[in-house]
Amino acid sequence: MTGTSRPIIHVRSAFISDIHLGSRECRAELVLEFLRRVQMEQLFLVGDIVDVWSLRRSFYWPQIHNDVLRTILGKTKHGTRVIYVPGNHDEQMREICGTLFGNLEIHREYVHTTLREQKLLVMHGDEFDGAVQCSRWLTALGSGLYDVTLGANRLVNALRRRLGYPYWSLAGYLKSRVGNAMKYVHSFEQAAAQAARRRELDGIVCGHIHRPEITELDGILYCNTGDWVESCSALIEDRGGELELWHWNDAGSALQAAPKPAVKALPRAA
């Protein structure tokens, strides 16, 4: 890794989720490269930063996972405001929401105001599981089958790296082609947008489903940060207040901005 030789990128806010430290599928080297190269005024950790579920099944904690946490905590000491909104895989941290862990702020949820005065609800997203009807296939995918898929994903990408090809998400490819999975994603997005609408906010930022997205749903801005297992993505608010998705490519760890969606700037909520 050559993070020190690459230019530093300055942004206003960065939102990342679903890193899953403690899991073998975590792309910790890319998370670390991202954190070292991107200088942000505010860093939002939108849940599932540490995968306690995976650690309980089989303890796995290499040095690079420590390095990620140290880098995050280091940012709190050098001018970055870090706001942590725990998810379902690190739900133990929800017991101390509303407190400070050093300079790290821990919240059950948070309302972020962009430079363009858009008010965005920030929450992990597992809160919507009860409102979404999951099929049997998705229930299995969320446990054993999903673990198998990610294992296959790791092998496929090891081969692709040897052949000089960039990272490709097998799990994401399969989910995008299964009707029930897409129905679940649609229901999740609608439930998330409704949560922001009920509070008269302009939009919502969440994670949980490992599917990065920026779109407008009936006047509500829906943003999903994605993950660092499959997508290796982050939601970025640039210094002008514009939101976009970034994907961190392991082919030289090159930064790739996702195409900007056709979403108009939303008016500030009354």
What spans do the regions from the language model cover?
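C-terminal regulatory/interaction regions
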Residues: 3, 248-270
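Core catalytic region of metal-dependent phosphoesterases/phosphodiesterases
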Residues: 4-12, 23-115
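Residue-level marker for buried hydrophobic side chains located in beta-strands
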Residues: 13-15, 43-45, 121, 205
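Catalytic core of the metallo-beta-lactamase
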Residues: 23, 28-29, 116-122, 128, ...
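Short glycine-/acidic-enriched loop or helix-start segments at secondary-structure transitions
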Residues: 54-56, 93-96, 132-133, 214-216, ...
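Conserved beta-sheet core of the metallophosphoesterase superfamily
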Residues: 103-109, 121, 126, 130-140, ...
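Active-site-proximal loop/helix segment associated with metal-binding centers of metalloenzymes
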Residues: 123-188
